[in-house]
Amino acid sequence: MRHYEIVFIVHPDQSEQVPAMVERYKTMIAEANGKIHRLEDWGRRQLAYPINKIHKAHYVLMNIETTPEVVEELETAFRFNDAILRHLTIKTKHAVTEASPMLGGEKAKNLLSGASEEAVAQ
């Protein structure tokens, strides 16, 4: 199995649907005996540039270990889900479990533990 980092951006009007989407994707990974090493909900953030006249979006980060077939299935699900504005999948060499730099000093939600965490800005 290979390691991947996935970030997807959800339309701000669909922010309430993000937990259900994440659960669906977690199920797809678990059914293929994959592992989720890191799952973070970055919340609504300002986009660097407007996408379809939208200036803010809901961000989610996942670090997973699974087969390439499951990643293709996830990307197909992203493509056919109109709520997902953009997605990016990167193959990594090893599992990443520490908090991402995007969380620096801000309150964010780690979806694996289900608890809110306060990251310390350095």
Swiss-Prot record:
GO terms for cellular component: cytosolic small ribosomal subunit. InterPro entries: Ribosomal_bS6, Ribosomal_bS6_CS, Ribosomal_bS6_sf, Ribosomal_S6_plastid/chlpt, Transl_elong_EF1B/ribsomal_bS6. NCBIfam families: S6. GO terms for molecular function: small ribosomal subunit rRNA binding; structural constituent of ribosome. GO terms for biological process: translation. This is Small ribosomal subunit protein bS6. Transmembrane segments: none annotated. The gene is rpsF. Belongs to the bacterial ribosomal protein bS6 family. It comes from the Bacteria. Pfam families: Ribosomal_S6 (PF01250). Keywords: Ribonucleoprotein, Ribosomal protein, RNA-binding, rRNA-binding. Binds together with bS18 to 16S ribosomal RNA.
